[in-house]
Design a protein with these regions (language model features):
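Juxtamembrane regions of bacterial inner-membrane/periplasmic proteins
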Residues: 2-321
Length: 321
């Protein structure tokens, strides 16, 4: 009897071993098929991205610039027979396009160090940041300056995998057809900086009352921090919040060797004067209206501007029908 039981146990072990091998084989097959499928899909996606990147221009920056809503100016001669700006006319977007060579290098570097420190090295996509954002290892966003610019024309804010792939394709395509300087110029002229300002020129005028070319290092960093949260970091509404982030921006610039230690300390200690500050003095050619004459002057300007608009419309209709 004992011998029979041992023989029976041996027979039972064989089917169990066989079943285990079959299960292992099935698991291996599933893994291999999964890996092959992933490789095929990945290769297909990679091929399409590379083909799109090296294909025809997806976003023509010249057309993009021409299609942007831009501010118009109305000028008149004052009592000294000098031509002065009477009014600025704009729609929903207050934008004055400014060429890259008119922008201070400190302004460009402030945005780069804060938004995309490897901007000058990558080819449209910072894969380290993308991986970090996808895996949660990085606290910041994964989009580069080029990707942010590529996203603007579509105005697509929905966060989906498909949209992200399209954004990556457009960014790589942009870098194939345009220089870093051209991309940065377009970006700095289209991003929203609060108070209805689109681009650094109108933001500079709105917050500091000066041309963007006149901004110093401290002022450049002040503008750069607004884009993250235009209301929270609006220097007219929340100067304290703006100042904290401005100092962080200057710290990043110092770490990236975009500025020296002396420049950093000078900028951190610089007393900022905004257009709503008590010590603000308007630039030449513009007057600071007093309470008494403000309404009277505005009524005169409105009448003059309306007259100019009607005259221009009449002339255009006569010329073009």
């Amino acid at each position: 009897m004992g011998t029979a039981k041992k023989s029976s146990k041996k027979k039972n072990k064989k089917p169990n071993k066989k079943a285990g091998r079959i299960a292992l084989l099935v698991i291996l097959c599933v893994l291999v098929v999964g890996m092959l499928t992933t490789a095929i899909i990945g290769g297909y996606v990679f091929f399409n991205i590379v083909s799109f990147a090296h294909g025809e221009i997806a976003i023509n920056l010249d057309d993009y610039k021409a299609n942007q809503n831009q501010t118009s100016f109305v000028y008149a001669y004052d009592s000294n027979n000098e031509l002065v700006e009477m009014a600025q006319l704009h729609g929903e977007e207050n934008r004055i396009w400014v060429d890259s060579d008119k922008m201070p290098e400190n302004l460009k570097n402030a945005f780069i160090c804060l938004e995309d420190k490897r901007f000058k090295k990558h080819h449209g996509v910072d894969w380290l940041r993308t991986f970090g954002a996808a895996t949660g290892l990085s606290s910041g966003g994964g989009s580069t300056i080029t990707q942010q610019l590529a996203k603007n024309p579509t105005n697509d804010k929905e966060v989906t995998v498909v949209r992200k792939f399209k954004e990556i394709e457009r960014a790589l395509n942009l870098e194939q057809h345009y220089s870093k300087d051209a991309i940065l110029e377009a970006y700095l002229n289209t991003l929203y900086l609060g108070n209805g300002c689109y681009g650094v020129q109108t933001a500079s005028e709105t917050y500091f009352g000066k041309d963007v070319s006149e901004l110093n290092l401290a002022e450049c960093a002040t503008l750069a921090v607004i884009t993250k949260a235009p209301t929270t970091y609006n220097p007219l509404l929340n100067p304290e919040s703006n100042k904290k982030r401005q100092e962080l921006c200057l710290k990043y610039m110092l770490e990236e060797k975009a500025i020296s230690k002396e420049e950093y300390e000078e900028a951190v200690n610089y007393k900022l004067v905004f257009t709503n500050s008590e010590g603000y003095v308007p630039k030449p050619g513009k007057t600071k209206n007093t309470t008494e004459d403000k309404n009277t002057e505005k009524e005169y300007q409105d009448f003059y501007v309306d007259y100019v608009i009607k005259t221009v419309c009449k002339d255009l209709m006569s010329k073009y029908g």
